[in-house]
C-alpha cells in the first residue's frame, strides 16, 4: 500500500505532453510525449533536420512549443522558468569555451553564471573525471576538438544542484577512452537521482541505467518508439 502510494505521487523528473514544434512553418513533430523518471536516460534519435536540437532547446525553455506542455517535477516550466533554468545543464553543439582563457578560467566563468564559485581544486577534480586535470592551466585555443568536448562534459560535475542534463551529441569528437569516461560520469549522475535527455546518432548503452529511445524520424525503425508515442521511464 505504502509503495503504491509513493509511486502514484512521485512526479517524473521531466514530462512532455502533446508537444508540437515547427520550423519555418513546417512541423518538425507533433503530439510528442514522454515521462522521464529520476535516474533515467532518454536518448533522442533521428536523421539530421528531424528536430533533435530544436526539441532539446524547447525542453531547456530556450524556445516555446507551438502546442503542448513541459512539466518539471510536476510544474509547468513556463510558470517556473527561473527555477527550471537554474537547475538544469544544457550542452549544445558549440562548446562555449573562450580561446584566450585557460580551462580553469573558462569553467570558473561559466560557473559564475550560476552564482557558483568553484575553487581551483574543485575544477581540477571535475576535470579529472574526464582525464583533463593536467590541462587546468592550458589555453582553450590549444586544445583539440576532443579535448574541448571532454572539458565541456567535465564541467557538468561542477553543478550538483542541476539534476537535469540536456546534452546535444555529447559523444561527438570523443575517442574510446573519452566515451568510457563520459559513460561513467553519466552513470554516476543517474545513480544519484539525476536525469538525462541526450540527442545522439548512437544508442547510449550505460550499464545499469534505464534508457528509453525516442525517434523523431518518420517512420521510426522497426520496434522503436516514434515522436507520437508516449515514452515512460521507470520511476525511482
UniProtKB/Swiss-Prot annotation:
Its EC number is 7.6.2.5. GO terms for biological process: cytochrome complex assembly. Its main location: membrane. PROSITE patterns: ABC_TRANSPORTER_1, ABC_TRANSPORTER_2, CCMA. Keywords: ATP-binding, Cell inner membrane, Cell membrane, Cytochrome c-type biogenesis, Membrane, Nucleotide-binding, Translocase, Transport. It is found in: Cell inner membrane. It catalyses: heme b(in) + ATP + H2O = heme b(out) + ADP + phosphate + H(+). Gene3D superfamilies: P-loop containing nucleotide triphosphate hydrolases. It is a peripheral membrane protein. GO terms for cellular component: plasma membrane. ATP binds at residues 46-53. Part of the ABC transporter complex CcmAB involved in the biogenesis of c-type cytochromes; once thought to export heme, this seems not to be the case, but its exact role is uncertain. Responsible for energy coupling to the transport system. The complex is composed of two ATP-binding proteins (CcmA) and two transmembrane proteins (CcmB). Belongs to the ABC transporter superfamily. CcmA exporter (TC 3.A.1.107) family. This is Cytochrome c biogenesis ATP-binding export protein CcmA. The lineage of its organism: Bacteria, Pseudomonadati, Pseudomonadota, Gammaproteobacteria, Chromatiales.
